[in-house]
Amino acid sequence: MLEVWGSLKNLDVMNEVEKLLSSIDTAPVVYTNFLENYTKEDCYAFVEGDDDVLFYNSQFQKCNLTKIKIIVCEGKQKVKQCYECFNWSRFSKKQIVFLIDKDLSDIIDDPNDFSDENVYKTPMYAIENIIASSENFENTLSALGFYNLRDQQIERLRHDFLVEKETFEEKMLLVMAIIIRWKSMHIKPANYNNVKVKDFCHISDDCHVVFLSDQEIIEKVYKASQVDLGEYDAEKISNIRNEIHEKRHKIIRGKYVVSLYLDYCNAIAKRHHSKHLLDLRNDSILSSIVCKGKNLLQVCDYYRVLSAMCPLLPCFCEFVNRTVMQYKKKAS
């Protein structure tokens, strides 16, 4: 059974653990807790946050890995701090792994990024980008009650989604270019966590992505992030935008992609519900919400429901097979 921490003790390693604990005064609490609970029999995965637990639980299960302890570190920086605490002459890199988001590390220096044979990075910005993929779109339709559509209808919905997602990514390059410039220039406070896609983008009744003008987007992004608009350099932002264009499918911030995905899925469900095309059978996860006419998907559904539906990532399966699976085979 997969679990998030446990309370098992292994007396055979406690003496060694006590020595390690006594020598580490500034280690993250997560790491010291790990040492106190460590056993040689278990495998461990350090992740950034609670949302990662839901996603990686499902991915591990799809890899036929039935037992691994997932440890939440509360942020990428703390995952790295935990990694740096380990003496790898004492622990196996096949037993202990670290799962982090790639973020923008392919484009700019990320002080919290790190690499090793036991470090897995998402192939896109974050796990949200993976969940909001065309591969998971059909699963989402099922969760919304689209049971009886023909293959041709499903393919049409997927095609329409990809067209709108492409429009979204093209436009969001402006926002990402601004963020990249802020990061590379160390502009503060640059609170881009405050940027809400809904402030400048919405899904129309006929399920199309609609944006405000570039100038309006720029003003809203700078205001929300508490950055002086005088810092805006049109030429440099344009250059960055051109440089990152080919990577647009992988670098749009995950939280922004979530916003598009939820709104778009809600829009098509409402539209088809009004045409009586949804089969709201009892086992439809969200059927009761649909019937009440409320928003069909919320952020909690995004992780709780859609994470579990996401297909297995081949790159993740390969990572698991060459790390924790190897450790378990050797131990058995």
Predicted regions located by residue number:
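Acidic, divalent-metal-binding catalytic cores of TOPRIM
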Residues: L2-S332
